[in-house]
Amino acid sequence: LDPFFLTNSSQIPGLLKRLDDEISSGHPTFDGFIDDLQMFQDHRSDADVVGLKAKLKHAERIDEYESAEQKKELFAKLLLRLQHYPSAQRIFALFLARINDVFEHHITPHVTDADMDRRKVDEIIESKIILPTLSDMGDGFEHFTINHAHVRGMIYWLAERCFVRWK
């Protein structure tokens, strides 16, 4: 696990504790989205390849499409269920920012490199996104856990909004 990609160890556990308190109080406390999450809610308009299916096809990953749609929807439902809790929004914003950063700096600029094949991209996604995110979440708690499918769903959700591209 690359320690550079782990969120400050105090951020996620503290946010999870606050989220547990927010949920236990019995009522959502927030309408709208915090700025850090709103940025990802809005679709980018400068993309030349639009839509998840088109992006996967362009990246020669169309075989992932059905699974990608399911995982994207799984994450979208989780986001919808927890969107009224500020701490959940902060957690999602941190994870989405990590995904965006890894793609912007470690994947997309290097797609033409000779050694940047699909396997290498998948290794980067696993080591710099999925494993650190699951590690940050720890055990989660009864109201909020994240698994591999949720994290991949976040990637596909961002791809749909034109923040992530494999090529």
Predicted segments, located by residue:
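Long, low-complexity, intrinsically disordered terminal regions
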Residues: 12-167
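Long, low-complexity intrinsically disordered regions enriched in small/polar
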Residues: 1-17
